[in-house]
Regions:
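Histidine-centered active-site/metal-ligand motif
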Residues: 62, 126, 162-164
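Surface-exposed strand-loop junctions at beta-sheet edges and helix termini
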Residues: 69, 78, 129, 135-136, ...
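Terminal peptide-recognition signature
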Residues: 67, 81, 101, 144, ...
Length: 204
């Protein structure tokens, strides 16, 4: 991906080599990743992965980036922003604890903030329940500030520990947006939910 993003803080500090998953052939069976950190890709069709009723049997195109690590791994805000909303998406296979942060960013990101500013929202999902303690809408967050930790499987929607990070140019009504869409909806979804590497950098 040929982008030169302005300076943003890492959402997860990847301080050692990491594994980039390829889920286009479905989730790997009977294989334990030997790396502490893992990446799940954006704009990836993931057949056989989303099997709960929440996904309606047709949504399998991933429109965020997954940053995997041990439960309790700190999650940081990539820029200065404001808590927009938060809550627990409790359906089986959903996000579990979720925080939405609102940002005013030069968009798309460019050197020297060359582009006009606009509001952009970021979802931080599959968090620990305690990550929501003490939060309030309108609360300011600092660039690089710790805002959450990765949740355990029993609290994060039923997934291995990771944070689903997703950008949105559409303001969420509630602390939830589709992180997986139907393939027929891909074109509009990639407009509404742009590539997180615009702020995360070239992770792969």
């Amino acid at each position: 991906m040929d982008t030169e993003p302005e300076e943003f803080a890492p959402v997860v500090i990847l301080d050692e080599p990491y594994w980039v998953y390829n889920f286009t052939r479905g989730p790997p069976a009977d294989w334990d990743c030997p790396f502490t950190y893992q990446i799940g890709r954006y704009d990836e069709v993931r057949p056989g992965m989303y099997t709960t009723p929440l996904f309606g049997g047709e949504r399998d195109l991933h429109v965020g980036i997954d940053l995997g690590g041990p439960a309790g791994t700190p999650v940081h805000s990539f820029a200065e922003g404001t808590i927009h909303s938060f809550g627990i998406n409790s359906e089986d296979g959903s996000y579990g604890p979720t925080i939405v942060v609102e940002y005013d960013l030069s968009w798309p990101p460019a050197p020297l903030n060359a582009n006009p500013k606009r509001k952009v929202w970021a979802l931080y999902c599959h968090l620990s329940t305690e990550s929501l303690d003490g939060l309030a809408p309108g609360q300011r967050v600092q660039s690089g500030g710790r805002i959450a930790t990765m949740g355990k499987k029993h609290e994060n929607g039923g997934w291995e520990p990771h944070v689903h990070f997703q950008l949105s140019l559409v303001e969420p009504v509630v602390p939830d947006l589709p992180g997986v869409v139907a393939r027929a909806d891909r074109e509009q979804a990639l407009i509404d939910y742009p590539d997180p590497r615009l702020v995360l950098g070239a992770l792969y």
